[in-house]
Amino acid sequence: MGDVKNFLYAWCGKRKMTPSYEIRAVGNKNRQKFMCEVQVEGYNYTGMGNSTNKKDAQSNAARDFVNYLVRINEIKSEEVPAFGVASPPPLTDTPDTTANAEGDLPTTMGGPLPPHLALKAENNSEVGASGYGVPGPTWDRGANLKDYYSRKEEQEVQATLESEEVDLNAGLHGNWTLENAKARLNQYFQKEKIQGEYKYTQVGPDHNRSFIAEMTIYIKQLGRRIFAREHGSNKKLAAQSCALSLVRQLYHLGVVEAYSGLTKKKEGETVEPYKVNLSQDLEHQLQNIIQELNLEILPPPEDPSVPVALNIGKLAQFEPSQRQNQVGVVPWSPPQSNWNPWTSSNIDEGPLAFATPEQISMDLKNELMYQLEQDHDLQAILQERELLPVKKFESEILEAISQNSVVIIRGATGCGKTTQVPQFILDDFIQNDRAAECNIVVTQPRRISAVSVAERVAFERGEEPGKSCGYSVRFESILPRPHASIMFCTVGVLLRKLEAGIRGISHVIVDEIHERDINTDFLLVVLRDVVQAYPEVRIVLMSATIDTSMFCEYFFNCPIIEVYGRTYPVQEYFLEDCIQMTHFVPPPKDKKKKDKDDDGGEDDDANCNLICGDEYGPETRLSMSQLNEKETPFELIEALLKYIETLNVPGAVLVFLPGWNLIYTMQKHLEMNPHFGSHRYQILPLHSQIPREEQRKVFDPVPVGVTKVILSTNIAETSITINDVVYVIDSCKQKVKLFTAHNNMTNYATVWASKTNLEQRKGRAGRVRPGFCFHLCSRARFERLETHMTPEMFRTPLHEIALSIKLLRLGGIGQFLAKAIEPPPLDAVIEAEHTLRELDALDANDELTPLGRILAKLPIEPRFGKMMIMGCIFYVGDAICTIAAATCFPEPFINEGKRLGYIHRNFAGNRFSDHVALLSVFQAWDDARMGGEEAEIRFCEHKRLNMATLRMTWEAKVQLKEILINSGFPEDCLLTQVFTNTGPDNNLDVVISLLAFGVYPNVCYHKEKRKILTTEGRNALIHKSSVNCPFSSQDMKYPSPFFVFGEKIRTRAISAKGMTLVTPLQLLLFASKKVQSDGQIVLVDDWIKLQISHEAAACITGLRAAMEALVVEVTKQPAIISQLDPVNERMLNMIRQISRPSAAGINLMIGSTRYGDGPRPPKMARYDNGSGYRRGGSSYSGGGYGGGYSSGGYGSGGYGGSANSFRAGYGAGVGGGYRGVSRGGFRGNSGGDYRGPSGGYRGSGGFQRGGGRGAYGTGYFGQGRGGGGY
């Protein structure tokens, strides 16, 4: 095989070109591989090899490139020596026509229902078909982005990136703000004679009502439209935000000028200057280290009315990389005999390394034929599959896919398209002796869908997952064989894999495209480009109830195949029907006084519960008018469940509810009712955050006489099919996350679902017999529902997607997003670019820096990613990864009321920190589970903690650490440490300092009781779920008035969630952008005033600049963390000192009655010999907290190992448990110091002595669950 490299070199030499090879090590020390990429000038393709040694990697990369040259007819296949280069099958372009017969929806159904309730079925069949070869209309939806970026390129202005000193938003967008934008927009409307009207949508229940305003305007001089959709707590704010987005877009398109007047800022509440008690000795040390770092400090201003800026510019910058002029495309290549597409690596050993495609195809065909003849169970399953509606369309589907690069399959719920279409393709290739040419990846919107569908398909093929069918979701993979296989995965997993290209995959099937999440929209842009560059690839788009015309147009008028479902009709009813059938009378309204932040706001959106037809009785109209439209009526759901009993039609009931809180409350509500809590009912929750074992229960049949009631979010709306569901009760709501960029505000709103969502939910009934769907919204409300939900790309920050665009080398961020099916607003794109430049993730040429490359690989918010890197530098990487991972999931506290009880508050110790509470919970749980699964369950029940959340946090943390280690960070800086939250702990001080960096600009100042001030003195409240929230009207005094927080939540009031107390020195160091001094007072970010010496403040801002410079050096070469030069070590020690509360004169032990009248929390055990959770040399697993961590305990029978159960993984397992056999003890063999002589911190085994990486394999696509330690 080595000759292939010479062949390519000779071929290039004849054309006066030279192949360029780039090789790098990937993976960690124990399983290192080498990735080689080869490029040839003039060809937009990168050949790739991934092997265990450099020579094979180079040969495989050359071979891949030669195969590409054969495919594009640059080389004839017979000219190539026998390297196993296969010619692609010929591609025909015959246009295909597809069936578009009308779908019959039955209008009547039997059943014991009152005849006056029979409703007309809607006729919603409207999709036709068109030939693929017909060119579509010009696609110019992203023209605004294209215009802006083309003008920017023409000017070729080298941005000096000085906007760091400017307000994040206004300065970036021509100084247009909430206050001045609406007036300018009105002027523009008058001049252009535009009738601009805001379209308002109300979201949330009465006590948490807010509004969305949206508007589309046509710009004559550009010949295009721009669109904005923004959120506000009332109509006025929503309209102002919408106007602001429109004006900023007009500014960037050159239609309106920058604002030149004085920006009037609303005067927020002023903060009194805070006196910082800094010792003379510490100030002297600060000045010394600044001198050592050769930094110059500005003297105080001569005139106090002209303050000086203390911020020091960047001390180190990444060298700009070469600007990417070519618009990149993710590379694709067809399946090849020695390439495993699921691990993105070459097969260099074993029989498959040298097998020809013909041999592979013949072996797999013989195996399938033998199985079909001998396996009687399989024959029975095949007969079942024959009955699925999609089976009738098999030949039509296969023909369309073979003739067209892109095909859309629109199939009614339950027709079998998700499980059958991939198998049709696979079996067709195997039976036609082309097995080696087929590998199919199928994306699902959620992990439960990917796993359950993969398990179902494996069952239908008479196999276990891991043979011809597998899955890969975050934290868990069972990979199929390298050839003739189907891989089900989440969209996020596929996007992570794209860095290695879509190599070795013949078909990409994207299921549920109507969901319009940001990842699916991003994937569709990637695939559209791939199809244009590589027409041989096959893309299949599938969904149930979408208007496919937009997707059809986007993919060049591709054909649409309509598949009709089972003929069981589903009768649907609305709120008025449900009330009349059940004779429901609402209970008396609860008169309890609302909290102050739940009040206010006028509701001028019509209450549709007051609109009821004359055909309903007066009792029905009265009951309906008494129901609050914004609340989910639990009592009506109970009444419907009792009504369903009277129908005597057996079947499961699926109840759609918006969010985990309602599911949990409804479950408890039903279980406490003697009727529904009895053995006659099985109440099951279904939510993405519950363990897989719990999720699987919803598929299990129940005994005769038992009714299964499934309480689910919209997770059950798509892909997963629960066969025995006959009844659907639909709240008609769902929970969405809305983010407003200009004020950094997050809002979790319960909103009305769209008509598309309701149609999907209705379709879940009637799989086994005629079904019933009860919508808990009135007919009048249904008529007002949106047809589709707003795409996620319009309501979420874009910086994570922007990083992916750069990592995949897809060109400019704006230019790429302009190609989206519905491009995001221009101002959102510019903000994403600015955020990444500010973090040093992009260089002067807008290409990824080494830091940006690491951040792009971390599946977490980029600012948190940089915080984790800084954590590694301070050797507190594990704690920072734990906190970052915990932010991905709900809090682990199980809490009945809104405020936390003492059992949960005690985890914060005396740190006044929600983040420290999370860290302590995780630490205590991690210790408890050393005693096995039963000990873990007991601990979680006793402390009222959600075990599933803690397990998922652990998995996420391990994955984040794995990525950092694979990026070259030393394992030592990511070791687990013990923290104390009740006494001095400098490591914990540093963690809090870095947290202040990670959550910036979320800083607040405590005034009184729950009242706090956020940026620019705006009023807000401490969130009720915080450990810092006082009980009732209790007034609290904290050791420091300053806090950082995770996010601002907009309810009726604005509240800060996830709060941690910080010192003013920590703010100056890591949570500030603009620092000014007049010689007496230091002003931070224009609102926080500190009484601190000018010199001390200047030295601290200098330390920040030095720290940023060190991050630049470390990300170029992470291994240098273990051998920093003395000056940097002293600088880090200085930051450690400044991070201590005592450095700012703050005593955390002040105020022993921290949480009101309750008992003082018990002190946590000191971690000395033999006491506390981690008992020195005699730890739970027989010693070896650090040593056993990787001496084989975890992998051999660990989580996902041979025992394949939580008990085996989290408890003792087969091979000695998670922390393994006695190998040294956490503090040495007999409680010695951390790095003591008798084994020490890491024991004699070290961090990673396992024989393999178990479940994590090679990144997302892992090597299955197999052996070895972690």
Swiss-Prot record:
Sites bearing Omega-N-methylarginine, chain numbering: 1175
Start and end residues of each stretch annotated as Necessary for interaction with RNA polymerase II holoenzyme: 255-664
Role: Multifunctional ATP-dependent nucleic acid helicase that unwinds DNA and RNA in a 3' to 5' direction and that plays important roles in many processes, such as DNA replication, transcriptional activation, post-transcriptional RNA regulation, mRNA translation and RNA-mediated gene silencing. Requires a 3'-single-stranded tail as entry site for acid nuclei unwinding activities as well as the binding and hydrolyzing of any of the four ribo- or deoxyribo-nucleotide triphosphates (NTPs).
Mutation effect (residue 1166 to P): In MRD75; likely pathogenic; does not localize to the nucleus
Superkingdom of the source species: Eukaryota
Sequence segments annotated as region (Interaction with CREBBP): 1-250
Effect on the protein upon substituting residue 339 to A: Abrogates transcriptional activation and RNA polymerase II binding by the MTAD region. No change in ATP binding and ATPase activities
InterPro entries: DEAD-box_helicase_OB_fold (IPR011709), DEAD/DEAH_box_helicase_dom (IPR011545), DHX9_DEXHc (IPR044447), DHX9_DSRM_1 (IPR044445), DHX9_DSRM_2 (IPR044446), DNA/RNA_helicase_DEAH_CS (IPR002464), dsRBD_dom (IPR014720), HA2_WH (IPR048333)
Keywords, sorted A to Z: Acetylation, Activator, ATP-binding, Autism spectrum disorder, Biological rhythms, Cytoplasm, Cytoskeleton, Disease variant, DNA replication, DNA-binding, Helicase, Host-virus interaction, Hydrolase, Immunity, Inflammatory response, Innate immunity, Intellectual disability, Isopeptide bond, Manganese, Metal-binding, Methylation, mRNA processing, mRNA splicing, mRNA transport, Nucleotide-binding, Nucleus, Phosphoprotein, Repeat, RNA-binding, RNA-mediated gene silencing, Transcription, Transcription regulation, Transcription termination, Translation regulation, Transport, Ubl conjugation
Name by which UniProt lists this protein: ATP-dependent RNA helicase A
Disease cited in the entry: Intellectual developmental disorder, autosomal dominant 75: An autosomal dominant neurodevelopmental disorder characterized by developmental delay, mild to severe impaired intellectual development, and neuropsychiatric manifestations including autism spectrum disorder, anxiety, and obsessive compulsive disorder. Disease features are highly variable and may include hypotonia, seizures, non-specific dysmorphism, poor overall growth with small head circumference, abnormal brain imaging, and heart disease.
Entry similarity comment: Belongs to the DEAD box helicase family. DEAH subfamily.
Residue numbers spanned by region HA2: 831-919
Quaternary structure note: Component of the coding region determinant (CRD)-mediated complex, composed of DHX9, HNRNPU, IGF2BP1, SYNCRIP and YBX1. Identified in a mRNP complex, at least composed of DHX9, DDX3X, ELAVL1, HNRNPU, IGF2BP1, ILF3, PABPC1, PCBP2, PTBP2, STAU1, STAU2, SYNCRIP and YBX1. Identified in a IGF2BP1-dependent mRNP granule complex containing untranslated mRNAs. The large PER complex involved in the repression of transcriptional termination is composed of at least PER2, CDK9, DDX5, DHX9, NCBP1 and POLR2A (active).
GO molecular function, one term: metal ion binding
Stretches the record annotates as siRNA-binding: 5-9, 53-55, 182-186, 234-236
Stretches the record annotates as MTAD: 331-380
Motif DEIH box mapped to chain: 511-514
Residues reported in the UniProt entry to bind ATP: 411-419
Residue segments, region Necessary for interaction with H2AX: 313-952
Domain Helicase ATP-binding residues, every copy: 398-564
Nuclear localization signal (NLS1), short sequence motif: residues: 586-595
Record motif Nuclear localization signal (NLS2), residues: 1155-1173
Effect of residue 1166 to L: Abolishes nuclear localization
